[in-house]
Amino acid sequence: MAEKFDHLEEHLEKFVENIRQLGIIVSDFQPSSQAGLNQKLNFIVTGLQDIDKCRQQLHDITVPLEVFEYIDQGRNPQLYTKECLERALAKNEQVKGKIDTMKKFKSLLIQELSKVFPEDMAKYRSIRGEDHPPS
């Protein structure tokens, strides 16, 4: 899989370099540089075709739109990954807190029910395979 990305990266780098060189030619255009301009335009067309071929190999890859927004804003796209991981960690901690609270509630509920309904709770524990009442 990394080979496909490397291939695309190589074509993109060549394409960007051709665009840069085209900008230099156009910014100081002389009639004598027409042949060089035509050559660069042909390289750009070929580069776009090469990139399109790479696209077909990577059709199953999806990139969240937020990553493109980060790039458009001049931010590092790796910050998106970092922030997603931080949000997932925070959500994980929140859910863990809820689970811990429910476990404590269950334990307290069983203790109180054991005080009020000792015979029924003994049956419950035997069905559940628990030998001793929770402390």
From Swiss-Prot:
UniProt name for this protein: Mediator of RNA polymerase II transcription subunit 10
InterPro entries per record: Mediator_Med10
Gene that this polypeptide is encoded by: MED10
Function recorded in the entry: Component of the Mediator complex, a coactivator involved in the regulated transcription of nearly all RNA polymerase II-dependent genes. Mediator functions as a bridge to convey information from gene-specific regulatory proteins to the basal RNA polymerase II transcription machinery. Mediator is recruited to promoters by direct interactions with regulatory proteins and serves as a scaffold for the assembly of a functional preinitiation complex with RNA polymerase II and the general transcription factors.
GO biological process: positive regulation of transcription elongation by RNA polymerase II; positive regulation of transcription initiation by RNA polymerase II; protein ubiquitination; RNA polymerase II preinitiation complex assembly; somatic stem cell population maintenance
Main localization (coarse): nucleus
Organism this protein belongs to: Homo sapiens
Residues that span the membrane, as ranges: none
Pfam families: Med10 (PF09748)
Keyword match Ribonucleoprotein: no
